[in-house]
Amino acid sequence: MKAFVTGAAGFIGSNLVDRLLAEGHEVIGWDNYSTGQERFLEAASRSPRFRMVRGDVLDRAAMSKAMAGCDTVFHLAANADIRDGWAHPARDLEQNALGTFNVLEAVRAAGARRLAFASTGSVYGEPAVSASAPTPENAPFPTQTSLYAASKVAGEGLVSAYAEAGHLDEAYVFRFVSILGDRYTHGHVFDFCRQLMHDSGRLRILGDGRQRKSYLHVQDCVEGVLHAVGRGAARSAPHRTEVYNLGTDEFIDVRASAGLICAAFGANPRLEFAGGERGWVGDSPFIFLDTRKVRATGWSPRFSIAEAVPATVRWLQANPWVFAARS
C-alpha cells in the first residue's frame, strides 16, 4: 500500500502513520500543524518509507500533487473542537466539509481508488434509542447538536456520493467514539488532567457529570480501521461504501471518568459543576455505539475504558509539554 494520511501529525493520524510504517507500507503525511505536533512524527521521520508534507486540506492543487501515486487515502484532518464551534462557525464548514470535498477532488485527480474517512458518533445527535441501548450504523440521523457533527454528516454524504459515482472503488466511513491514548491532545480527560496538574485540590466539570460517554484506545482505533479496510468489504458493497461504528461495548459517565483520572493522580479534589446539564452547546448527553458489525469481521478492542483512561493520564503526566503546545 502507498498511503496518503491527512492530519498525519495529529493524535490519531500520527498513531496511524506509525502503524502503517510498521506494517511495511509507504506513507505520505499531510498536515497544516494547526493542532498537530512534529514531535509525534519523530519515529516516522526516520523511516525511508515516510515523507511529510506541510499543507492544508483547503489547498486542493497542492494536495493533488502530493497525493500522486498513492492508492489509499486516510482522511483524518479536521477541526475537532466541538465546544468552540459557535465561536468560529466557519471553521467546521471549511476544515471539515469543504476540506473533505477537496480531499475527494484530489483523490479523483491523483487516481487513488480507496478512501477511509474519520467520522464521529456525534452524527447520531441524540439518537432515538432507549436509555442504555447502543446506536447502530443504520440509525436515522436526528437533529444535529453541533456544527462539528453537522460537518461530518456532510463529509459522509460527499464520500458516499463520490463512491456511488464511480470515483472510488472502496469507501470506508468510521464513526468513532471519543479516542484516548498516547498523543491525546483534546477532550475532557485532557482538560481534567491539565486542571489537576495545576491544582490537585479542585476539579471543575462542565455539565452535571451525568453525561455518558464511550471511549476507545487509539491503538484499538487504528487497528480497527486497518482491519476493516484490509478486508475490502466495500468493493462488493451495493454503493461501494461501508460504514462502521468503532468503540467499546461499554460507557461511563463523566463523574466516574473523573474518578478514574483522580485515582491515577492520587488526588481527591473538590468537584465543582458548571454550565447546567450539559456544560456547553453541542455536548451529547449519551454516546454509545453498537459495534456488532465490525466485531463480526473479527476485530475487537483490547483496552477497556478502565484501562484506557489511566493509560492516557500516565502519558500526559510523562509529556507535560503537550499542555503548553495546546494552550
Describe the predicted segments one by one.
Residues 6, 30, 73-76, 115-121, ...:
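SDR active-site strand-loop-helix element
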Residues 87-102, 113-114, 123-173, 178, ...:
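Catalytic helix-loop patch of NAD(P)-dependent Rossmann-fold dehydrogenases
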Residues 16, 197-327:
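C-terminal substrate-binding subdomain of Rossmann-fold SDR/epimerase-dehydratase oxidoreductases
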